[in-house]
Amino acid sequence: MENRANTEGTFERELEFTALTRWFHWIRAIAIFVLIVTGFYIAYPFLTPIKNSEPTNFMYALARSWHQIFGFALIAVTIFRVYLFIFDKGCRVERASFWDLINPLTWFRQLRNYMLLGPHPHLKGVYNPVQLAAYMGLMVLILLISVTGIILYYNVYHDGLGAILFAIFKPLEVMFGGLANVRAIHHITTWAFVIFIPVHIYMATWNSARYPNGGIDSIFSGFRYHKKHY
């Protein structure tokens, strides 16, 4: 059991991310990385195994299989993560960030801080408004790439799970304007992830270097540290 605070020494330790939140973060990170690599290979097979007379070396089929496995893993983990964010008691401090998101003054102070023109604002939750807005944008991207990925899946696999998904998602395929548009949206959304990842890493590193009281460490340990006030 993780304690909420450790009052020994000159710092107090506060739990910022629960174990499930941290595990889901890294599962999604690995899944997104694998999906990007395999997705680009599926779109443009840049490696081809040496041809032989035996039914082996199906590299394209292997890439597609891994793409599907990690795609469904991303969907499952994201659904559970959204559930935790809304209902889990351990995520109360994350939900509190919503009040900073709708506060114009907090937005102003946070942007001023990013421009090195002012101190870091006091926040009610874990995320500052820019972080929470980016996190919500990421959820929209995951939703979009998941829906388009499911549509592409059932257009290849017509029986079993594919038949069930076809009955549910076919109206969305029509709404998107057909399979060609779905594939284009899926590909464009992939590039949105490619852009998001280095920006996310840079901002997380910048924030950790400027305010070394947890930062990136917290997504590993779960804790953030604050100086004690006597």
Swiss-Prot record:
Subcellular localization, as worded in the UniProt entry: Cell membrane
Keyword Transmembrane helix: yes
GO cellular component: plasma membrane
Domain of life of the native organism: Bacteria
Main location, first listed in the record: membrane
Bilayer topology: Multi-pass membrane protein
One GO BP annotation of this record: respiratory electron transport chain
Pfam families: Ni_hydr_CYTB (PF01292)
GO molecular function terms attached to this record: electron transfer activity; heme binding; iron ion binding
Keywords: Cell membrane, Electron transport, Heme, Iron, Membrane, Metal-binding, Transmembrane, Transmembrane helix, Transport
InterPro entries listed in its UniProt record: Cyt_b561_bac/Ni-Hgenase (IPR011577), Di-haem_cyt_TM (IPR016174), Hydrogenase_cytochrome (IPR051542), Ni-dep_Hydgase_cyt-B (IPR000516)
UniProt-listed PROSITE patterns: NI_HGENASE_CYTB_1 (PS00882), NI_HGENASE_CYTB_2 (PS00883)
Transmembrane segments: 23-43, 67-87, 134-153, 188-205
Gene3D superfamilies: Transmembrane di-heme cytochromes, Chain C
Role this protein plays: B-type cytochrome that interacts with quinones and anchor the hydrogenase to the membrane.
Family, similarity comment: Belongs to the HupC/HyaC/HydC family.
Name of the protein in its database record: Quinone-reactive Ni/Fe-hydrogenase B-type cytochrome subunit
